[in-house]
């Protein structure tokens, strides 16, 4: 009986130390991830200029156009993370909170001085950078999204750090799939969506590898 009590007494501290070590390792991994993605984020240019567009950081002045364009079920139904209905609070939160997070790097797509959409990267722990985007419905069919995506992935590749970029689209979203294909993305696999509007629905995962010459 004394032996059993002694073993039980020893087991508690050992398990406590092991749990503490595991927690410390997870915290270290999380801190390392934050440093890595912040470095990736900061290596991207603050401003990207194309033939017709300027990609730049979202600003508070974008809120009215964000609200006008993003509050549209024709857009939201294709996106996993866009709230619907889209409120002024959502627009302000995007500009002042989400856009400032180290694991997000969104760009406002602007035509002249007017926001027409958003494109950017998310950096989830343990995953390659993921491209996401949306374009206001009045600007569909004019090649703006393809132009913006091509410019952003080219800028990412020029850093020398974005070896692979992923993108996920709902399987029946042909327009978005064509944008990615025109930018050089290749189909990688089929899957099921996990969050938001994509949850449980068939999705296509595409990827773009950095050209060897860059």
Q: What is each PLM-predicted segment?
A:
Residues 1-77, 106-214:
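Acyl-donor (CoA/ACP) binding surface of acyl/acetyltransferases
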Residues 60, 85-89, 103:
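Generic alpha-helical scaffold signal
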Residues 74-96:
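Conserved GNAT-fold acetyl-CoA-binding loop/helix
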Residues 83, 99, 120-123:
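Short coil/turn residues that cap or connect secondary-structure elements
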Residues 97-103:
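Short loop/turn motifs at secondary-structure junctions and domain boundaries
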